[in-house]
Swiss-Prot record:
This is Nucleotide-binding protein KPK_4305. GO terms for cellular component: cytosol. Disulfide bonds: none annotated. It comes from Klebsiella pneumoniae (strain 342). Keywords: Nucleotide-binding.
């Protein structure tokens, strides 16, 4: 029986490249001359710390970072940015988290979405991924389109497609 896995992963090497590109752009921009503005990628926590001297500049830095992530093939919805910007001394910062894996609430929404579609497929939750099996390849491709089209708040990839 054909099957595939639905996963949500961020390539950390591409994220590192995007952070480096964003840092290079900030160094060359006129509006950030003489301003302490940095990006720090923490591989262990899978977070990106955006630091600057004002909250407005932090928002500008986040826009630059999102653009660079998108150019490297990482969707903006994979970056979980908290609403509040932390003020510490003379700097403002925000620590954005890269979404890795599918949370259980989102997994349940995906399984419910697949079951409500009345396609002849089965969806099983396996850790941080979902295995979808069915008799027809066309049904599996319909499920892929359904998951891509559903507004679930994070990007998904499809792996281990087997016939």
């Amino acid at each position: 029986m054909p099957s595939f896995d639905i996963v949500s992963e961020v390539d950390l090497q591409e994220a590192r490249n995007a952070v480096d590109n964003a840092s290079r752009e900030v160094e060359s921009r006129f509006d950030f001359r003489g301003v302490e503005a940095t990006f720090e990628l923490n591989d262990a926590n899978k977070t990106i710390k955006v630091l600057s001297e004002s909250d407005f500049q932090v928002n500008q830095l986040l826009d630059i970072l999102r653009a660079k992530l998108l150019k490297r093939g990482i969707e903006g919805t994979s970056l979980d940015v908290p609403e509040d910007i932390v003020h510490s001394g003379k700097t403002w910062f925000v620590e954005a988290k890269l979404k890795q894996g599918i949370e259980s609430a989102v997994q349940k929404k995906i399984v419910k979405l697949i079951k409500d579609s009345k396609l002849k497929v089965q969806a099983q939750i396996q850790g941080e991924e979902i295995r979808v099996t069915g008799k027809s390849r066309d049904d599996l491709q319909s499920v892929m389109a359904l998951v891509r089209g559903g507004d679930l708040g994070q990007p998904f990839q499809f792996k281990n497609f087997r016939d």
